[in-house]
Amino acid sequence: MAHIHNDDFEMAKSDPQALFAFRGTPRKVLFNPGDRLFRFTSQPQGTFRGNEIFSSPWWHAQSTFNAIVRTANATGNSVADAARSGLAVSPNWNPTMEWLVIIELTKPVYGWVGPARHQPVKDGDRSALFLGNADQAYVPGLATGGNGMSSPFANIYYYGSMMGV
């Protein structure tokens, strides 16, 4: 049987900040070829260098994207605002969230999925929080052997602007 990417990865021994990004303990999930993973990104601007595509381990599944769109429609907020709140993404990490990246897996990979932990709207000020609670996926090492725009485990399926959506 072929080795599955991240099969030997131990989330409990990973970066403590990654574990802290989840509300509770994330569950190990097998993503199969043909599965699509999503993430919102920001382009470089000022001192922000932009979000990398495959180098970042943070993604979410189609079901989370669908829930974000439903929330945006129900509240009248933009998809980016609904995503920022549900995924608890600080503007310091991703200032605009105006671009959507969808990748399609070409090989099976393991990831860890669970609800996003709340995060402060502004660093150091816990008086206002992004609530989180939307399922996020931590899938490390997708860029192994590739670069920021390619991966031996996935192809870019879609990369486009979310401005005005």
What is the role of each PLM region?
Residues M1-D8, Y157-V165:
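Short amphipathic alpha-helical segments
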Residues M1-R23:
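N-terminal low-complexity, Pro/Thr/Ser-rich intrinsically disordered segments
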Residues P16-G164:
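Catalytic toxin/effector domains delivered as secreted proteins or via bacterial secretion systems
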